[in-house]
């Protein structure tokens, strides 16, 4: 399973990338706005830090605008993936970008029928928002299972990128239900390392190590 960071904070990306555990990065306009820097400047720097996919979202909601922005974004680096919202104009854009062999990430997916449409359009990635689905009292994990079954039934190559991951349980369940990859904020990524028994065990080892001669 591939693990992505959902952030535009360069320092956070550098930290996790230094462990050799991050496969890519996802961004959105809200995350980049927090940086106070220009959109393209941030994407270019992120692409220089990680070699894997970096999702950069178009700002327009119209086909012509999305295409113009997408073609500019892919010039930044070879690992840029064009992120588009799951709306009719967005999927029309995905169809055209797919014809040009430009990778895409369809975002804001909240239902299996939406995911089916994205796959038919040729999306490289589909991003179901697990945490936000849970917030509406629906089951975000069931959504992953439904998408996985549909894609397997019909042989779609679109990769399931579980998004809106809030912590280790979301990641574990996404992995068990067949998501190909997952993206999460820096804080959630750091939670993956932690377990109280690990801390207790390490404390005991360190205490015992004081009795040893190196």
UniProtKB/Swiss-Prot annotation:
GO terms for cellular component: cytoplasm. The keyword NADP does not apply. The active site is at residue 83. It catalyses: D-sedoheptulose 7-phosphate + D-glyceraldehyde 3-phosphate = D-erythrose 4-phosphate + beta-D-fructose 6-phosphate. Pathway: Carbohydrate degradation; pentose phosphate pathway; D-glyceraldehyde 3-phosphate and beta-D-fructose 6-phosphate from D-ribose 5-phosphate and D-xylulose 5-phosphate (non-oxidative stage): step 2/3. The keyword Cytoplasm applies. GO terms for biological process: carbohydrate metabolic process; pentose-phosphate shunt. It comes from the Bacteria. Its EC number is 2.2.1.2. InterPro entries: Aldolase_TIM, TAL/FSA, Transaldolase_3B, Transaldolase_3B/F6P_aldolase, Transaldolase_AS, TSA/FSA_arc/bac. It is found in: Cytoplasm. Keywords: Cytoplasm, Pentose shunt, Schiff base, Transferase. SUPFAM superfamilies: Aldolase (SSF51569). One of its GO terms (molecular function) is aldehyde-lyase activity. Transaldolase is important for the balance of metabolites in the pentose-phosphate pathway. Belongs to the transaldolase family. Type 3B subfamily. This is Probable transaldolase. The lineage of its organism: Bacteria, Pseudomonadati, Spirochaetota, Spirochaetia, Leptospirales. The gene is tal.
């Amino acid at each position: 399973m591939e693990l992505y960071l959902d952030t535009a904070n360069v320092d956070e990306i550098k930290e996790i990338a230094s462990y050799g555990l991050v496969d890519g990065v996802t961004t959105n306009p809200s995350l980049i706005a927090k940086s106070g820097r220009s959109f393209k400047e941030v994407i270019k720097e992120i692409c220089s830090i990680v070699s894997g996919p970096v999702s950069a979202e178009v700002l327009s909601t119209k086909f012509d605008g999305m295409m113009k922005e997408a073609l500019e974004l892919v010039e930044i680096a070879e690992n840029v993936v064009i992120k588009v919202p799951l709306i009719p104009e967005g999927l029309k854009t995905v169809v055209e970008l797919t014809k040009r062999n430009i990778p895409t990430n369809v975002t804001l997916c909240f239902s299996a029928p939406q995911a089916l449409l994205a796959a038919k359009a040729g999306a490289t990635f589909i991003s179901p928002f697990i945490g936000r689905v849970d917030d509406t009292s629906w089951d975000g994990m069931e959504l992953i299972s439904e998408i996985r079954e549909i894609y397997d039934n019909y042989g779609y190559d679109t990769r399931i990128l579980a998004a809106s991951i809030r912590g280790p349980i979301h990641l574990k369940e996404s992995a068990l239900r067949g998501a190909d990859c997952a993206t999460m904020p820096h804080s959630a990524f750091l939670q993956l390392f932690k377990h109280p028994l690990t801390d207790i065990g390490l404390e005991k080892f360190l205490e015992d190590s004081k009795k040893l001669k190196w």
